[in-house]
């Protein structure tokens, strides 16, 4: 996702820290890859910044080399491979991964605004955003009203013929589109909006699912597409049970006018970052370090955090030569009384 931004943003931090860098763009976006190769060659001396292209075999060969630092953005499974390879050389690294980022909507939330901001965060880039809302839990007393608002918002965003709307994107590969299509077909009975698929066009319609359970295939892995499972809840225990089944998400979103409720959620559960009464926007601030925790990644970047990621602090002492205390040097026998007096 975002192959230009996710290549250049870490590079800025690396250059700011005085490093040379090797870039490896995603092989799933070949046109972007070719453009980036050209631009990087035009802008940088290859002794300082170079680009390597190729498939997973090139990735494996690259990871066999010794680097001072590795920065990886991608899936959890590939992140594990990168970390295992880095361990051979004890290379420090940052992993920007993903996970099932939840949205919690309570009974005090502004439903119209919640629906709009959730739909915007979910369906931009056809759902292919690492911090996109992955599923929504809504208080049972406002669940049906929320679903109605959500459907209204999606229609207002993209119209009746979403496939012909140039503002709605496509899935990056046919393989990923097929994966999403299978999830839709396997959960067709719970679709309340959307569900259309055109694999040749790599089009997956924004699709909303109703009353999804924790055992559903939709709740197994990060969806990374325009599929939005929803479920109702009645108690905090139900929320906790769901969040514990999918721990350490990259993002966490709460929609509520109840400050105590929001505070309870964001302090009790571990996640990378998030928003109260919004989605996605925490990523846009250069003042806020961005990154995951646990299975959603490790390390932080953006703004000053990027500089800190690609540098390390050296602890140094510069002693004066004008003053010299013989007290610290042996033999200590004659100095013991003085030392005890000082220590009192």
Question: PLM features: what roles do these ranges have?
Answer:
Residues 76, 141, 257-260:
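Alpha-helix/helix-capping structural signal
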Residues 203-344:
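Conserved C-terminal structural/oligomerization subdomain of aldehyde/semialdehyde dehydrogenase
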Residues 44, 78-213, 276, 338, ...:
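ALDH superfamily catalytic-core signature
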Residues 59-60, 115, 240, 263:
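Short hydrophobic/charged patches on amphipathic alpha-helices used for structural packing
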Residues 64, 97-98, 129-131, 164-165, ...:
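Short glycine-enriched loop/turn motifs at secondary-structure junctions
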Residues 18, 49, 70, 99, ...:
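Residue-level signal for inorganic ion chemistry
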Residues 1-113:
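Rossmann-like NAD(P) dinucleotide-binding subdomain of oxidoreductase/dehydrogenase enzymes
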